[in-house]
Amino acid sequence: DYYYRAGVDLTKITEIPKLMPIVNAKPDSELLSDLDATAAWAKSQGGDTGRLGIVGFCRGGRSVWEYAAHSSQLKAGVAFYGSLIDPPNPLWPKSPMQLAGDMKAPVLGLYGAEDQGIPPAQVEQMKAALAAAGKTAEFHIFPGAPHGFHADYRPSYRKEQAEQAWGEMQAWFRKYKVLT
């Protein structure tokens, strides 16, 4: 697990306010290095990195955008409600919005219309920035869905939207040959 280096078993933390300081203390440089190492390890084990894809939720969704701007090996990504605009932070030097012009892989962004942290207006900003840069991305903003609509262990779970989003993710990965 990426966060295990913090010395804490994140599976034992059930309160988001206790979890986020640990999650947010990880620098982008370490994340990208770890993802590169994971892809290299998969290749060394016989994995077909010609079909390399990434999916993430919340902070992991942000990581999808970051890795799509970083890796020329990546074939496609899917970001479930990943943040697009970050407050200034030396650990995260650029937000996904600032990296729009650097995207190297197509990304599908799946967001909730009722997300209090990532309002639809931000999603539209990202969509416009990517289009202006000539990058490939699609977005779906799900009506009635809050942040975390795919987390079936939380009150934010929305079964219908989660199932639809999962199907869209699979179709996206098939389109870009990550899945067959």
Language model features: what each stretch is:
Residues 1-180:
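N-terminal cap/leader regions of alpha/beta-hydrolase-fold enzymes
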